[in-house]
Amino acid sequence: MTVEGVADRRTAPSARYQPVLGTLGFVWDQAADQVLLIHRTRRADGKHNGLGGKLEPDEDIVTGMARELHEEAAIVPTDMRLRGTISWPGFEGPDGDDWFGFLFLITRWTGEIPDSNDEGELSWVPRSRLMAWCDPATRSDSGLDLHEGDVHFLPLLFDDDPRPFHALMPWEQGRPTGWSVTRV
């Protein structure tokens, strides 16, 4: 299958898709209907995002997500569900590093969440504000700055469909160039 914007980058017959494996988790306080976001002020683009990062060689995705939650928010998840996966070819870096992410929704945890960490500031955002960012008509009113492609998957994280989603979102020159998703 050829995906626009991806095939052009891989002209060498020996080129293989060997993405960075990562986790991305959204901590949801259901009682308050708020989602924990980090404003990654350490990075030049300073985006708001869920918590997560690269898997270590000795980790499975659950262990890696739990480690990232502890490192970034000082919490231990007690209810964590894999909601989906996304392949992000060309996502990050000057050469467009490929990423493959495992997306989690965390609804119970132990620990006290600090106001910040080495990556940036942590804050609780009403889920309605996060969903407002996903709507082009209300995006500017949300006061959030997320990655442009997040508009596609954020609603899937919080919907009632129990099936995980599996998506492809190619990137080129710092912007998403496509989106396809399947649920099984």
Describe the function of each predicted region.
Residues 2-50, 77, 81:
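N-terminal strand-loop-strand
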Residues 32, 43-44, 88, 107-112, ...:
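Short, charged/polar surface micro-motifs in flexible loops or helix N-caps
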Residues 38, 114-117, 165-168:
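Short, hydrophobic secondary-structure boundary micro-motifs
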Residues 48-50, 55, 113, 169:
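Short clusters of hydrophobic/aromatic residues that line enzyme substrate/ligand-binding pockets
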Residues 55-78, 89-149, 156-157, 179-184:
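Unchanged
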